[in-house]
Amino acid sequence: MKPQTKLSENSSRCEKVLYSEVITQLIYFLTSKKITNLGKIRLVKSIRDSFLSQLENILCFFLVYRTTYSFGVCLMKRFLFNKFFNRHPFTRVKSCFSSSSPSKFSFTQWLVGFTDGDGCFSISKQKIKNGKNKWSLTFKLTQNLYNYRILYFIKRNLGIGSLYKESSTNTVIYRLRRREHLKKIIDIFDQFPLLTKKYWDYYLFKKAFLILEDANLNSFEKNSKLEEIRIEKKSLKQYSPVNLEKYLTKSWLIGFIEAEGSFYLLQKSPVRIIHGFEITQNYEQPLLAQISEFLFNSQISPKIKSKKNSLITNYSLSTSSKERMLFLSSYFENCFKGVKSLEFKIWSRSLRKNYNFEQLLRARDLIRKLKNKYSRGSQHPKDK
Protein backbone atom coordinates (compact mmCIF):
# COMPACT_ATOMS: atom_id res chain seq x y z
CA MET A 1 0.00 0.00 0.00
CA LYS A 2 2.90 2.39 0.58
CA PRO A 3 3.75 2.73 -3.11
CA GLN A 4 0.11 3.66 -3.76
CA THR A 5 0.22 6.39 -1.07
CA LYS A 6 3.31 7.91 -2.64
CA LEU A 7 1.69 7.89 -6.04
CA SER A 8 -1.39 9.64 -4.66
CA GLU A 9 0.70 12.32 -2.92
CA ASN A 10 2.76 12.89 -6.05
CA SER A 11 -0.43 13.13 -8.10
CA SER A 12 -1.77 15.94 -5.87
CA ARG A 13 1.48 17.87 -6.08
CA CYS A 14 1.61 17.42 -9.87
CA GLU A 15 -1.97 18.59 -10.21
CA LYS A 16 -1.29 21.83 -8.31
CA VAL A 17 1.84 22.51 -10.36
CA LEU A 18 0.01 21.84 -13.62
CA TYR A 19 -2.94 24.12 -12.88
CA SER A 20 -0.63 26.86 -11.62
CA GLU A 21 1.48 26.72 -14.78
CA VAL A 22 -1.61 26.73 -17.03
CA ILE A 23 -2.82 29.98 -15.48
CA THR A 24 0.65 31.57 -15.56
CA GLN A 25 1.21 30.71 -19.23
CA LEU A 26 -2.26 31.87 -20.30
CA ILE A 27 -1.87 35.24 -18.55
CA TYR A 28 1.55 35.78 -20.12
CA PHE A 29 0.53 34.87 -23.67
CA LEU A 30 -2.80 36.69 -23.64
CA THR A 31 -1.43 39.94 -22.15
CA SER A 32 1.94 40.09 -23.91
CA LYS A 33 2.27 43.09 -26.22
CA LYS A 34 4.59 41.08 -28.43
CA ILE A 35 1.69 38.98 -29.66
CA THR A 36 -0.71 40.42 -32.23
CA ASN A 37 -4.49 40.07 -31.98
CA LEU A 38 -4.35 37.45 -34.75
CA GLY A 39 -1.73 35.57 -32.75
CA LYS A 40 -3.94 35.66 -29.66
CA ILE A 41 -6.91 34.34 -31.64
CA ARG A 42 -4.83 31.48 -33.00
CA LEU A 43 -3.51 30.71 -29.53
CA VAL A 44 -7.01 30.62 -28.03
CA LYS A 45 -8.19 28.31 -30.82
CA SER A 46 -5.18 26.06 -30.28
CA ILE A 47 -5.83 25.88 -26.52
CA ARG A 48 -9.55 25.25 -27.13
CA ASP A 49 -8.87 22.44 -29.62
CA SER A 50 -6.26 20.93 -27.32
CA PHE A 51 -8.63 21.09 -24.34
CA LEU A 52 -11.56 19.53 -26.20
CA SER A 53 -9.34 16.80 -27.62
CA GLN A 54 -7.91 15.92 -24.22
CA LEU A 55 -11.36 16.12 -22.60
CA GLU A 56 -12.55 13.47 -25.07
CA ASN A 57 -9.50 11.34 -24.28
CA ILE A 58 -10.01 11.62 -20.52
CA LEU A 59 -13.69 10.63 -20.80
CA CYS A 60 -12.65 7.56 -22.78
CA PHE A 61 -10.05 6.83 -20.14
CA PHE A 62 -12.65 6.99 -17.34
CA LEU A 63 -14.91 4.59 -19.25
CA VAL A 64 -12.02 2.20 -19.69
CA TYR A 65 -10.59 2.44 -16.16
CA ARG A 66 -13.46 3.00 -13.72
CA THR A 67 -11.55 2.97 -10.42
CA THR A 68 -9.94 5.42 -7.99
CA TYR A 69 -6.89 3.19 -7.85
CA SER A 70 -3.94 5.63 -7.55
CA PHE A 71 -2.07 4.28 -10.58
CA GLY A 72 -5.10 5.02 -12.74
CA VAL A 73 -5.56 8.50 -11.24
CA CYS A 74 -1.92 9.39 -11.85
CA LEU A 75 -2.09 8.20 -15.47
CA MET A 76 -5.32 10.09 -16.14
CA LYS A 77 -3.88 13.38 -14.90
CA ARG A 78 -0.79 12.97 -17.03
CA PHE A 79 -2.89 11.91 -20.03
CA LEU A 80 -5.10 15.01 -19.77
CA PHE A 81 -2.28 17.56 -19.74
CA ASN A 82 0.30 15.89 -22.00
CA LYS A 83 -0.49 17.81 -25.22
CA PHE A 84 -0.41 21.29 -23.66
CA PHE A 85 2.74 20.82 -21.61
CA ASN A 86 4.73 19.15 -24.35
CA ARG A 87 4.76 22.60 -25.98
CA HIS A 88 6.09 24.55 -22.98
CA PRO A 89 9.46 24.63 -21.17
CA PHE A 90 7.99 24.30 -17.68
CA THR A 91 6.88 20.70 -18.01
CA ARG A 92 7.53 18.73 -14.83
CA VAL A 93 5.45 15.66 -15.48
CA LYS A 94 6.25 13.07 -18.12
CA SER A 95 3.55 12.48 -20.71
CA CYS A 96 1.78 9.18 -21.19
CA PHE A 97 2.58 9.70 -24.85
CA SER A 98 6.22 9.92 -25.82
CA SER A 99 7.26 13.40 -26.87
CA SER A 100 10.94 12.50 -27.08
CA SER A 101 12.72 10.38 -29.64
CA PRO A 102 15.25 7.63 -28.99
CA SER A 103 18.86 8.36 -29.80
CA LYS A 104 19.60 8.17 -33.53
CA PHE A 105 15.88 8.06 -34.33
CA SER A 106 15.15 8.34 -38.05
CA PHE A 107 11.67 9.54 -38.96
CA THR A 108 11.98 8.31 -42.54
CA GLN A 109 12.93 4.78 -41.45
CA TRP A 110 10.14 4.86 -38.85
CA LEU A 111 7.68 5.91 -41.57
CA VAL A 112 8.77 3.02 -43.81
CA GLY A 113 8.22 0.58 -40.94
CA PHE A 114 4.79 2.04 -40.19
CA THR A 115 3.89 1.86 -43.88
CA ASP A 116 5.00 -1.78 -43.99
CA GLY A 117 2.39 -2.35 -41.31
CA ASP A 118 -0.51 -0.07 -42.24
CA GLY A 119 0.29 1.63 -45.55
CA CYS A 120 -1.58 1.35 -48.83
CA PHE A 121 -0.55 2.18 -52.43
CA SER A 122 -3.48 2.35 -54.84
CA ILE A 123 -3.77 2.77 -58.61
CA SER A 124 -7.30 3.62 -59.71
CA LYS A 125 -9.03 4.30 -63.02
CA GLN A 126 -12.08 6.49 -63.50
CA LYS A 127 -14.20 7.18 -66.57
CA ILE A 128 -14.73 10.86 -67.27
CA LYS A 129 -17.39 12.59 -69.39
CA ASN A 130 -15.58 12.53 -72.73
CA GLY A 131 -15.15 8.75 -72.48
CA LYS A 132 -11.46 8.89 -71.60
CA ASN A 133 -9.83 7.24 -68.61
CA LYS A 134 -8.50 9.25 -65.71
CA TRP A 135 -5.80 7.50 -63.66
CA SER A 136 -5.00 8.51 -60.10
CA LEU A 137 -2.38 7.36 -57.62
CA THR A 138 -2.93 7.47 -53.87
CA PHE A 139 -0.72 6.74 -50.90
CA LYS A 140 -2.64 6.50 -47.64
CA LEU A 141 -2.36 5.47 -44.02
CA THR A 142 -5.51 4.62 -42.07
CA GLN A 143 -6.01 4.61 -38.30
CA ASN A 144 -8.90 4.48 -35.90
CA LEU A 145 -10.11 7.94 -34.86
CA TYR A 146 -8.81 7.24 -31.35
CA ASN A 147 -5.26 7.11 -32.75
CA TYR A 148 -5.43 10.19 -35.01
CA ARG A 149 -2.39 11.61 -33.18
CA ILE A 150 0.03 9.37 -35.05
CA LEU A 151 -1.23 10.52 -38.46
CA TYR A 152 -0.87 14.14 -37.40
CA PHE A 153 2.70 13.32 -36.32
CA ILE A 154 3.39 12.02 -39.84
CA LYS A 155 1.75 14.99 -41.57
CA ARG A 156 3.67 17.45 -39.41
CA ASN A 157 7.02 15.80 -40.17
CA LEU A 158 6.42 15.43 -43.92
CA GLY A 159 4.79 18.83 -44.28
CA ILE A 160 2.48 17.55 -47.03
CA GLY A 161 -0.74 15.61 -47.47
CA SER A 162 -4.20 15.86 -45.94
CA LEU A 163 -6.17 14.25 -43.12
CA TYR A 164 -9.85 13.42 -43.33
CA LYS A 165 -12.34 11.44 -41.30
CA GLU A 166 -14.40 8.48 -42.52
CA SER A 167 -17.53 8.76 -40.38
CA SER A 168 -18.95 5.40 -41.46
CA THR A 169 -15.89 3.49 -40.23
CA ASN A 170 -14.80 5.87 -37.44
CA THR A 171 -11.34 6.13 -38.98
CA VAL A 172 -8.96 8.91 -39.97
CA ILE A 173 -6.98 8.72 -43.22
CA TYR A 174 -3.74 10.45 -44.13
CA ARG A 175 -3.65 10.78 -47.91
CA LEU A 176 -1.24 11.89 -50.63
CA ARG A 177 -2.52 12.34 -54.20
CA ARG A 178 -0.75 15.31 -55.76
CA ARG A 179 2.18 14.32 -57.99
CA GLU A 180 4.66 16.67 -56.34
CA HIS A 181 3.76 15.16 -52.96
CA LEU A 182 4.02 11.61 -54.25
CA LYS A 183 7.48 12.43 -55.59
CA LYS A 184 8.63 13.22 -52.05
CA ILE A 185 7.29 9.97 -50.62
CA ILE A 186 8.78 7.99 -53.53
CA ASP A 187 12.20 9.45 -52.72
CA ILE A 188 11.84 8.13 -49.16
CA PHE A 189 10.89 4.59 -50.22
CA ASP A 190 13.71 4.54 -52.76
CA GLN A 191 16.21 5.41 -50.05
CA PHE A 192 14.75 3.04 -47.42
CA PRO A 193 12.93 0.15 -49.16
CA LEU A 194 9.89 -1.61 -47.76
CA LEU A 195 10.66 -4.95 -46.09
CA THR A 196 7.29 -6.70 -46.43
CA LYS A 197 5.41 -7.81 -49.54
CA LYS A 198 4.23 -4.20 -49.83
CA TYR A 199 7.55 -3.67 -51.56
CA TRP A 200 5.87 -5.03 -54.73
CA ASP A 201 2.81 -2.78 -54.28
CA TYR A 202 5.19 0.15 -54.14
CA TYR A 203 7.19 -1.18 -57.11
CA LEU A 204 4.09 -1.09 -59.34
CA PHE A 205 2.96 2.20 -57.80
CA LYS A 206 6.26 3.87 -58.73
CA LYS A 207 6.14 2.26 -62.17
CA ALA A 208 2.70 3.81 -62.74
CA PHE A 209 3.94 7.16 -61.46
CA LEU A 210 6.81 7.21 -63.97
CA ILE A 211 4.42 6.33 -66.80
CA LEU A 212 2.08 9.19 -65.92
CA GLU A 213 5.04 11.58 -65.67
CA ASP A 214 6.52 10.51 -69.02
CA ALA A 215 5.94 13.37 -71.47
CA ASN A 216 7.01 11.19 -74.42
CA LEU A 217 3.96 8.92 -74.09
CA ASN A 218 0.54 9.83 -75.45
CA SER A 219 -2.71 9.10 -73.62
CA PHE A 220 -3.32 5.80 -75.44
CA GLU A 221 0.17 4.49 -74.64
CA LYS A 222 -0.11 5.51 -70.99
CA ASN A 223 -3.50 3.84 -70.68
CA SER A 224 -2.19 0.63 -72.24
CA LYS A 225 0.86 0.44 -69.95
CA LEU A 226 -1.20 1.19 -66.84
CA GLU A 227 -3.65 -1.59 -67.72
CA GLU A 228 -0.69 -3.97 -67.90
CA ILE A 229 0.33 -2.92 -64.40
CA ARG A 230 -3.13 -3.71 -63.06
CA ILE A 231 -2.86 -7.22 -64.52
CA GLU A 232 0.68 -7.61 -63.17
CA LYS A 233 -0.54 -6.76 -59.66
CA LYS A 234 -2.48 -10.03 -59.49
CA SER A 235 0.73 -12.08 -59.61
CA LEU A 236 2.83 -10.24 -57.03
CA LYS A 237 5.40 -12.15 -54.99
CA GLN A 238 4.92 -12.76 -51.27
CA TYR A 239 8.30 -11.57 -50.00
CA SER A 240 10.39 -8.44 -50.35
CA PRO A 241 13.67 -9.00 -52.25
CA VAL A 242 15.46 -6.51 -49.98
CA ASN A 243 18.40 -7.53 -47.79
CA LEU A 244 16.57 -7.64 -44.44
CA GLU A 245 19.71 -7.69 -42.33
CA LYS A 246 20.95 -4.48 -43.96
CA TYR A 247 17.77 -2.40 -43.79
CA LEU A 248 16.08 -3.63 -40.59
CA THR A 249 16.89 -0.89 -38.07
CA LYS A 250 15.54 0.13 -34.68
CA SER A 251 13.66 3.09 -36.17
CA TRP A 252 12.02 0.84 -38.80
CA LEU A 253 11.10 -1.68 -36.10
CA ILE A 254 9.52 1.00 -33.88
CA GLY A 255 7.28 2.06 -36.76
CA PHE A 256 6.39 -1.52 -37.66
CA ILE A 257 5.54 -2.46 -34.06
CA GLU A 258 3.53 0.76 -33.78
CA ALA A 259 1.30 -0.69 -36.52
CA GLU A 260 1.53 -4.46 -36.03
CA GLY A 261 3.03 -5.26 -32.62
CA SER A 262 1.17 -6.23 -29.46
CA PHE A 263 2.24 -5.92 -25.82
CA TYR A 264 -0.20 -7.94 -23.74
CA LEU A 265 -0.87 -9.64 -20.41
CA LEU A 266 -2.17 -13.21 -20.55
CA GLN A 267 -3.90 -15.12 -17.75
CA LYS A 268 -2.33 -18.59 -17.64
CA SER A 269 -4.15 -19.84 -14.52
CA PRO A 270 -6.57 -18.56 -11.85
CA VAL A 271 -3.63 -17.07 -9.95
CA ARG A 272 -1.04 -16.32 -12.65
CA ILE A 273 -0.72 -13.63 -15.33
CA ILE A 274 2.29 -13.30 -17.62
CA HIS A 275 3.58 -10.52 -19.88
CA GLY A 276 4.00 -11.19 -23.58
CA PHE A 277 4.97 -9.65 -26.91
CA GLU A 278 3.70 -10.72 -30.34
CA ILE A 279 3.79 -9.78 -34.01
CA THR A 280 1.55 -11.69 -36.43
CA GLN A 281 1.89 -11.50 -40.22
CA ASN A 282 0.65 -13.27 -43.33
CA TYR A 283 3.42 -15.06 -45.22
CA GLU A 284 6.23 -12.90 -43.74
CA GLN A 285 8.20 -15.71 -42.08
CA PRO A 286 11.67 -14.46 -43.23
CA LEU A 287 10.95 -10.98 -41.88
CA LEU A 288 9.76 -12.26 -38.49
CA ALA A 289 12.84 -14.46 -38.26
CA GLN A 290 15.06 -11.43 -38.89
CA ILE A 291 13.17 -9.36 -36.28
CA SER A 292 13.67 -12.20 -33.82
CA GLU A 293 17.40 -12.25 -34.45
CA PHE A 294 17.64 -8.45 -34.37
CA LEU A 295 15.93 -8.22 -30.97
CA PHE A 296 16.97 -11.36 -29.13
CA ASN A 297 20.01 -12.80 -30.98
CA SER A 298 19.87 -16.19 -32.69
CA GLN A 299 20.73 -18.17 -29.55
CA ILE A 300 17.52 -17.19 -27.72
CA SER A 301 15.31 -16.64 -30.75
CA PRO A 302 11.59 -17.29 -30.04
CA LYS A 303 9.87 -19.88 -32.19
CA ILE A 304 7.81 -18.74 -35.14
CA LYS A 305 4.53 -20.64 -35.24
CA SER A 306 2.77 -21.13 -38.55
CA LYS A 307 -1.03 -21.26 -38.43
CA LYS A 308 -2.90 -22.30 -41.54
CA ASN A 309 -6.22 -20.56 -41.95
CA SER A 310 -8.01 -21.04 -45.24
CA LEU A 311 -5.60 -20.15 -48.07
CA ILE A 312 -3.56 -17.72 -45.94
CA THR A 313 -0.64 -18.84 -43.81
CA ASN A 314 -0.15 -16.74 -40.68
CA TYR A 315 3.14 -16.55 -38.84
CA SER A 316 3.43 -15.36 -35.27
CA LEU A 317 6.57 -14.17 -33.51
CA SER A 318 5.76 -14.35 -29.81
CA THR A 319 7.63 -14.58 -26.54
CA SER A 320 6.83 -14.31 -22.82
CA SER A 321 10.29 -14.83 -21.32
CA LYS A 322 10.76 -12.49 -18.32
CA GLU A 323 14.32 -11.73 -19.44
CA ARG A 324 13.17 -10.69 -22.92
CA MET A 325 10.21 -8.72 -21.56
CA LEU A 326 12.52 -6.66 -19.34
CA PHE A 327 14.79 -6.08 -22.31
CA LEU A 328 11.87 -4.87 -24.48
CA SER A 329 10.63 -2.65 -21.65
CA SER A 330 13.98 -0.86 -21.59
CA TYR A 331 14.73 -1.00 -25.34
CA PHE A 332 11.47 0.66 -26.45
CA GLU A 333 11.13 3.17 -23.62
CA ASN A 334 9.86 6.56 -24.93
CA CYS A 335 9.94 5.32 -28.53
CA PHE A 336 6.32 5.05 -29.68
CA LYS A 337 4.39 8.03 -31.02
CA GLY A 338 0.71 7.09 -30.99
CA VAL A 339 -1.66 5.30 -28.59
CA LYS A 340 0.80 2.40 -28.66
CA SER A 341 2.91 4.57 -26.34
CA LEU A 342 0.19 4.54 -23.66
CA GLU A 343 -0.37 0.80 -24.08
CA PHE A 344 3.37 0.18 -23.77
CA LYS A 345 3.74 2.39 -20.68
CA ILE A 346 0.98 0.53 -18.83
CA TRP A 347 2.44 -2.83 -19.89
CA SER A 348 6.00 -1.82 -18.98
CA ARG A 349 5.05 -0.34 -15.61
CA SER A 350 3.10 -3.42 -14.58
CA LEU A 351 6.14 -5.53 -15.54
CA ARG A 352 8.73 -3.51 -13.62
CA LYS A 353 6.71 -2.77 -10.46
CA ASN A 354 5.95 -6.43 -9.66
CA TYR A 355 2.20 -5.92 -9.36
CA ASN A 356 0.05 -8.43 -7.53
CA PHE A 357 -2.52 -10.56 -9.37
CA GLU A 358 -5.41 -8.11 -8.94
CA GLN A 359 -3.34 -5.19 -10.21
CA LEU A 360 -2.11 -7.21 -13.20
CA LEU A 361 -5.71 -8.16 -13.99
CA ARG A 362 -6.69 -4.48 -14.03
CA ALA A 363 -3.72 -3.59 -16.23
CA ARG A 364 -4.61 -6.41 -18.64
CA ASP A 365 -8.24 -5.29 -18.93
CA LEU A 366 -7.17 -1.69 -19.47
CA ILE A 367 -4.77 -2.61 -22.29
CA ARG A 368 -7.43 -4.73 -23.98
CA LYS A 369 -10.01 -1.97 -23.85
CA LEU A 370 -7.52 0.54 -25.23
CA LYS A 371 -6.76 -1.83 -28.11
CA ASN A 372 -10.45 -2.27 -28.83
CA LYS A 373 -10.68 1.50 -29.23
CA TYR A 374 -7.80 2.06 -31.64
CA SER A 375 -7.28 -1.31 -33.38
CA ARG A 376 -9.33 -2.40 -36.38
CA GLY A 377 -10.30 -6.01 -35.72
CA SER A 378 -7.62 -6.54 -33.08
CA GLN A 379 -7.37 -9.92 -31.48
CA HIS A 380 -6.02 -10.82 -28.10
CA PRO A 381 -4.43 -14.10 -27.00
CA LYS A 382 -6.99 -16.35 -25.37
CA ASP A 383 -6.67 -17.03 -21.66
CA LYS A 384 -5.54 -20.51 -20.84
Curated annotation (Swiss-Prot):
SUPFAM superfamilies: Homing endonucleases. Transmembrane segments: none annotated. The keyword Repeat does not apply. It is found in: Mitochondrion. Its EC number is 3.1.-.-. GO terms for molecular function: DNA binding; endonuclease activity. The keyword Hydrolase applies. Probable mitochondrial DNA endonuclease involved in intron homing. This protein is coded in group-I intron 1 of cox1. Belongs to the LAGLIDADG endonuclease family. PANTHER family: INTRON-ENCODED ENDONUCLEASE AI3-RELATED (PTHR36181:SF2). This is Probable intron-encoded endonuclease Cox1-I1b. The gene is cox1-I1b.
